[in-house]
Amino acid sequence: TPSNSSAASDVYKRQVLSAIDEVDGPFAVINADDYYGRHAFEAIYNYLSEHEDDDRYRYAMVGYLLKNTVTDNGHVARGICTTNEEGELVNITERTRIEKRDGKIAFTENDGETWENLPEDTLVSMNMWGFTRSILDELKAEFPQFLKKGLTENPMKCEYFLPAVVSNLLEADRATAAVLPSTDKWYGVTYKEDKPVVVEAIRNLKKEGLYPENLWEE
């Protein structure tokens, strides 16, 4: 089932639900402080333009190659995607410690006592989702129950997880989530040492003409 903890998914639900009165069609959800690449946005746009809800909700998620999301400066947490033969999401397995080791990418589940290699082309979720407006109705419907339980059990830290709703819908066979593979490199500042790498990468994208020097120029 979709993981609740990958990247910043813990704040998604309340942010998305707060926009319910402003959203009137399909939309994408991303982490505000990450760079996802041009292809990812094109893939989400094309999918949402070509698909509508029918007997099930038709959602999508961009899957990144693991090698394009890791850092040289430490370990990261990533959601490892499992898909079916149709390329639809089956589940996301959270690996909380993945890092580069001896030229390979590996993860540990026991504080580094043992490591298991992961293929570089493993698809991972970086929390780029595409939804029809139906997800908002689902979020709204579950919110009162979340408040009742969360404010009773953990009023200071309870979080409303977006992937949990997707997971419930997939398990109930009420929705599908197409995994759209992307070869774009994902950039984020997990460690302070990552910042100059990201700055240089964005600068090079501008030099190549992929983006204007000032993104908001008319």
Residue ranges of predicted features:
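Active-site nucleotide-sugar/metal-binding loop of Leloir-type enzymes
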Residues: V16-P26
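Short beta-strand-to-loop acidic/aromatic patch adjacent to the donor-nucleotide binding site
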Residues: P26-Y35
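Conserved core of the sugar-phosphate nucleotidyltransferase
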Residues: R38-M128, R133
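Conserved active-site beta-strand element of glycosyltransferases/polysaccharide synthases
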Residues: G130, A177-L180, G188
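A C-terminal functional module that forms or caps the active site or interfaces directly
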Residues: L139-R174
